């Protein structure tokens, strides 16, 4: 039951993505359309000056992004809840 629901949801998502891409690029060939859908170059990560959740850090230095703090026990950035 869970597998069939997952496959149905995955099929609907794929149908939505293909439909959206075909509407945005009306007169493109299917090969160009598929290359735009599965393009990886557009999703390259940006370099940032701070470290996000789960990144390793050194306690005492301010390396983590805002709203994160370096855990002295685990030595990685975690959500800062305050005291």
From Swiss-Prot:
Give the keywords, sorted. Amidation, Disulfide bond, Ion channel impairing toxin, Knottin, Neurotoxin, Presynaptic neurotoxin, Secreted, Signal, Toxin, Voltage-gated sodium channel impairing toxin
User: Any further remarks?
Assistant: Negative results: has no activity on Nav1.4, Nav1.5, Nav1.8 and Nav1.9 sodium and calcium currents.
| Notes on the domains | The presence of a 'disulfide through disulfide knot' structurally defines this protein as a knottin.
Q: Which residues form the propeptide?
A: 22-48
Under the subunit heading, UniProt states: Monomer.
Identify the stretch annotated as signal peptide in this record: 1-21
Annotated organism of origin: Cyriopagopus hainanus
Family statement drawn from the similarity comment of this UniProt entry:
Belongs to the neurotoxin 10 (Hwtx-1) family. 15 (Hntx-3) subfamily.
Indicate what this protein is called per its UniProt record: Hainantoxin-III 6
What is this protein's tissue specificity according to the annotation? Expressed by the venom gland.
**Record's GO cellular component, any one?**
extracellular region
Which Pfam families does the protein's record reference? Toxin_12
Does Signal show up as a keyword for this record?
A: yes
Identify a single GO molecular function assigned to this protein.
Answer: sodium channel regulator activity
Q: Where in the cell is it found?
A: Secreted
Q: Which SUPFAM superfamilies match?
A: omega toxin-like (SSF57059)
Amino-acid biosynthesis listed as a keyword? no
Which cysteines in this chain are paired by disulphide bridges? 50-65, 57-70, 64-77
Q: Relate the protein's function as given in its record.
A: Selective antagonist of neuronal tetrodotoxin (TTX)-sensitive voltage-gated sodium channels (IC(50)=1270 nM on Nav1.1/SCN1A, 270 nM on Nav1.2/SCN2A, 491 nM on Nav1.3/SCN3A and 232 nM on Nav1.7/SCN9A). This toxin suppress Nav1.7 current amplitude without significantly altering the activation, inactivation, and repriming kinetics. Short extreme depolarizations partially activate the toxin-bound channel, indicating voltage-dependent inhibition of this toxin. This toxin increases the deactivation of the Nav1.7 current after extreme depolarizations.
